[in-house]
Amino acid sequence: TRKESSAASDVYKRQRKTAAAGVQVPPDLLYAYFRLSGRSRVLKAGSYEIPRGSSPEYLLDMLAEGRQAVRSVTLVEGWTFRQFREALARADHLKQDTTGLSGPEIMTRLDHDGIAPEGRFFPDTYVYPKNSSDLGVLRQALQAMDRRLEAAWSVRAPDLPLQSPEQALILASIVEKETGLQADRGQIAGVFANRLRIGMPLQTDPTVIYGASEAQGVAFEGRLRRIHLDTDTPWNTYTRPGLPPTPIAMPGNAAPVSYTHLRAHETKAN
């Protein structure tokens, strides 16, 4: 059985919690032990889970090293920003500081004002201390995607028909939704790169689906029909040439090589 003890540097004032955790030392003596150890000033505040029967030495090491109770949340490749937010809302012991905020408002809080949130967060498993803010997890994912996008853009092919890292991210998201197979991504990206080069519409179903659903804040239901293909939206790559205005999903780690470092024979695909 584990009991939670918070505010590590205030153990003396939290005698009941320490005793409930099963540390078999009177609180006054425990406090004195911490002071005499010479490490009392390095104890780290936070949320801790203390195993019942812990020794003073174990407890001191735990608090000095900041081994807080942590939880994790997994954000999956190919998810949309809406799905990311739903996963964060379900996460254990994660404060919901973004409740009621729009996507643009969240990006402003994350110091990315004016940037669309779709596609900007790297899918991965994120570990966080209990009772952290969901904004903290989003910031981790945002910074992780920024780093990967910058690295991929720095080694892009010289003749790539893309003008900015943002366009590369948009193309990466389309490739992500087109296939889950890493081996196919280069060929698919090559097809799209060639179409962009000659001004041909990309004609890819995932963008149509996004424009008919996620762009409106809802999940897509049913099957893709002719009416969807014929209905013009900024994301309909059948009715409009070029890239859509935003990514359509969160591309994973394998995507950057596919959309920024195409081999010559791939860019000749049609």
Where are these regions (language model features)?
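Short, flexible, glycine/charge-rich loop motifs used to bind or transfer phosphoryl groups or to couple energy/partner
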Residues: 1, 38, 158
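Single conserved hydrophobic/aromatic residue that forms the stacking wall/gate
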Residues: 1-8, 12, 261-264, 268-270
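Acidic-residue sensor for enzyme active/binding pockets
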Residues: 4, 77, 176-178, 266
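Signal peptide-directed extracytoplasmic domains
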Residues: 9-152
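Bacterial extracytoplasmic/cell-wall-associated proteins, especially those involved in peptidoglycan
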Residues: 86, 92-95, 108-263
